[in-house]
Regions:
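A conserved beta-strand element that flanks and buttresses the S-adenosyl-L-methionine
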Residues: 125
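Class I (Rossmann-like) S-adenosyl-L-methionine-dependent methyltransferase catalytic domain
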Residues: 1-54, 60-102, 106-116, 133-140, ...
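Conserved helix-to-beta-strand junction in the class I
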Residues: 147-148
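Conserved acidic residues
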Residues: 55, 122
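Short catalytic micro-motifs in class I SAM-dependent methyltransferases
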Residues: 128-132
Length: 210
């Protein structure tokens, strides 16, 4: 069951009068900074993309489409699915990137991923969206990814990990919770970035389906 409070808070970012300009400006800043955003300590995506040359991707919680379009424009991906629950965010994405190279899907990942037909190794991405979902929903998403992902697919997550922690829309799970759920995947957990709230947790990991 989608977290309604989290969704409403998320959607507020995209319905304000200046939302389009804010998002467009943020995209330009990422681009002008030579895409260093993808190599921050808590974001494993840059490393994963450098080490695994794939051509297909599923961006979960794609927002206004910066990463999805980056994959096509900068990494020459052939097909990118961008799953986003906010229709307002998708509308902004289509205005920023009118070429329609990304396949946008308006809906919840736990419902939409199972509809995808993937035949080649795929790059799955999340950026701090699973942390806002309940364990049951995340389990559903992960098990569906496991079911449809071809061998050698990659899961790159800028998500917190560490001792269990649940507070309102902020959820953290330990490494074994992730690796037990995706038993056939090989995990690498990043510990360069340490959270301060709550303390003692880290953020970012990669998994490869074997």
């Amino acid at each position: 069951m989608p977290n309604v409070e989290s969704l409403n808070q998320h959607n507020k970012n995209y319905i304000s009068d200046d939302a389009f300009e804010k998002e467009k400006r943020a995209h330009l800043e990422h681009n002008s900074d030579n895409f260093k955003f993808l190599y921050q300590e808590d974001i494993p995506h840059g490393d994963a993309l450098d080490n695994h040359k794939l051509s297909y991707a599923v961006d979960i919680g794609s927002g206004t489409g910066w990463f999805a379009n980056y994959l096509i424009e900068q990494r020459s991906y052939k097909k990118v699915y961008a799953i986003e629950p906010s229709s307002s965010a998708i509308e902004i994405a289509k205005k920023i990137y009118p070429d329609n190279k990304v396949k946008y899907i308006n809906g919840f990942a736990e419902e939409e991923i199972s509809k995808l037909k993937l035949s080649k190794p795929t790059f799955f991405s999340t950026m701090c969206c699973l942390a806002h979902l309940e364990d049951e929903d995340v389990l559903g998403i992960l098990k569906t990814i496991d079911k449809i992902a071809p061998v050698d697919s990659v899961l790159a997550c800028s998500e917190p990990w560490g001792d269990f922690y649940h507070r309102e829309c902020w959820n953290i799970r330990p490494p074994e919770w992730w690796s037990d759920t995706l038993a056939d995947w090989e995990f690498e957990f990043y510990n360069d970035y340490t959270l301060t709230d709550p303390p003692g947790r880290s953020k970012g990991f990669i998994a490869i389906k074997r």
